[in-house]
Design a protein with these regions (language model features):
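Hydrophobic alpha-helical transmembrane segments
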Residues: 1-61, 103-207
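Acidic (Asp/Glu-rich) catalytic motifs at the cytosolic membrane interface
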Residues: 59-106, 131-138, 193-194
């Protein structure tokens, strides 16, 4: 069994929601996990339809919120009912998180002409995931929170980006995206440097 480490800005309110409402969730843990496939498809459909009517981006916002809810409760439901699939859940939950991320970015590909910047966004996001899982393999501590940001905060960024495109159009996002990618690159380098430094110290203590 792995342990999670780190914290996010919204971790406290999330723990309250999980504790308060888990027993009312009507679906099983694996149903909640697999629903990410539905939300991913909705995001792609919304991006495609937004080419003709930008208001379809509100479907993207709804899909992000729904994916947040199902992702927040899938593990909690399994633990509460003692029906969790630990290994399957760990693999599918995190892999489908990446699928959702990729579909979200790909949906903007219908609206933005500069696909290279979007591809770089996916590469940088994958860099954070790779670092997380390599760190987990080395320490057995699973940290999905970096610099106070976790999945919830990232979803808020997704929603903000979607509303920005709906409000001001894709041109403004195209101007912001290079700076956003630069910011992500700086954070990724900082994360890798910090992680390798911590692992180095652990290795030196265990010599």
């Amino acid at each position: 069994m792995h342990t999670k480490s780190g914290r996010s800005f919204l971790g406290g309110p999330e723990k309250y929601l999980v504790k308060r409402f888990t027993k009312y969730v009507p679906l099983e843990t694996y149903h909640l996990t697999l629903l990410t496939l539905v939300w991913s498809a909705l995001v792609l459909v919304a991006g495609y339809l937004a080419q003709k009517n930008i208001d379809w981006l509100w479907l993207t916002v709804a899909a992000i919120v729904l994916q947040y809810i199902t992702d927040l409760f899938d593990g909690a439901v399994g633990r509460y009912r003692k029906t969790g699939l630990v290994k399957w859940g760990f693999y599918m939950d995190h892999y489908l998180d990446y699928v959702f991320l990729a579909c979200f970015v790909a949906s903007f590909g219908f609206l933005l002409p500069n696909i290279h910047m979007l591809a770089l966004t996916v590469i940088l996001a994958a860099g954070f995931m790779i670092s997380t899982f390599l760190d987990f393999g080395a320490t057995q501590e699973f940290s999905i929170y970096h610099f106070g940001f976790g999945p919830t905060e990232i979803r808020i960024v997704f929603i903000a980006a979607t509303i920005l495109v709906w409000w001001k159009g894709a041109v403004l996002l195209a101007q912001v995206l290079p700076w956003f990618n630069l910011f992500m690159a700086v954070l990724l380098v900082s994360l890798v440097y910090r992680t390798q430094k911590q692992l180095w110290k652990q290795d030196m203590r265990n010599r």
